[in-house]
Design a protein with these regions (language model features):
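Perimembrane helix-loop-helix junctions
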Residues: 192-206
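Specific aromatic-rich, kink-prone transmembrane helix
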Residues: 117, 157-173
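Transmembrane helix irregularities
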Residues: 94, 141, 169, 183-187, ...
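Start-transfer (signal-anchor) and selected internal transmembrane alpha helices
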Residues: 1-26, 132-134
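Membrane-helix interface segments
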Residues: 96-98, 127-133, 171-176, 203-206
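Short acidic/glycine- and proline-prone juxtamembrane loop motifs at membrane-interface regions
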Residues: 149-155
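TM-lumen/periplasm interface segments of multi-pass membrane proteins
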Residues: 17-124, 128
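Transmembrane and membrane-interface helices of multi-pass
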Residues: 125, 130-145
Length: 206
């Protein structure tokens, strides 16, 4: 019976995590309609403008484009660093609704990559598949993952890039690691301490 419970717990956590992620993050159950894909509007507007050769950092030009998809709630400027531009453009090249669903699907993939990374690292640290599977299930159940997916944010992209960038950097694959860490730098505040740590460990090639 104990063995059966050990198998059942991580499986249940993974299935429950996927249920929460898809139900509240993808489908949007229990969330206000105005909340869904809200942050994606900034990303799409910037990418759409960049494809047209316009400056997304000019608020007077940016605001009308943003208002065309979010109405009167457009208050903040586009504040991401320039190297998010190519990523934003692949959303902006699509109609708004289709682009939003593309990012939603990508956020599900990023969540799975995070869960896979957690599984791998915990298994390496403990040597136990059970602990690793349980940790991965808890990662999938994280309410923040569903929240970010529903809003259309980039935090899951940043987290997945940071985790796997760190992994490859410490396995002497600085090019892959460096590219992933550069992607994570679209939110620089999450990269300050990891970069300091890498420098202290003489991993500055990344």
């Amino acid at each position: 019976m104990y063995k059966s419970l050990r198998i059942a717990l991580p499986v249940a956590l993974v299935l429950l995590g996927l249920f929460v992620l898809i139900g509240t993050g993808v489908i949007g159950k229990g969330r206000d309609a105005n909340f869904l894909r809200q942050d994606f509007a900034w990303l799409w507007s910037a990418g759409h403008m960049m494809l047209g050769g316009e400056n997304a950092y000019d608020y007077d030009t940016f605001r009308p484009v943003l208002m065309s998809v979010v109405g009167q709630h457009a208050g903040n400027a586009y504040a991401y660093p320039p190297h998010l531009g190519p990523i934003a453009m692949h959303w902006g090249a699509l109609p708004f609704e289709i682009g939003a669903w593309v990012l939603t699907a990508e956020n599900v993939v990023f969540t799975l990559l995070l869960a896979g990374g957690v599984f791998m690292l915990v298994r390496q640290a403990t040597g136990e598949r059970w602990y690793a599977a349980t940790a991965a299930g808890l990662m999938l159940m994280c309410p923040y993952a569903a929240h970010v997916t529903a809003m259309g944010q980039t935090s899951l992209l940043v987290a997945a890039a940071l985790l796997w960038g760190w992994y490859f950097t410490y396995r002497d694959k600085p090019i892959v690691g460096g590219v992933l860490l550069a992607i994570a730098a679209i939110k620089p505040m999450f990269l300050v301490l990891p970069v300091v740590w890498l420098l202290l460990n003489r991993k500055w090639v990344a």
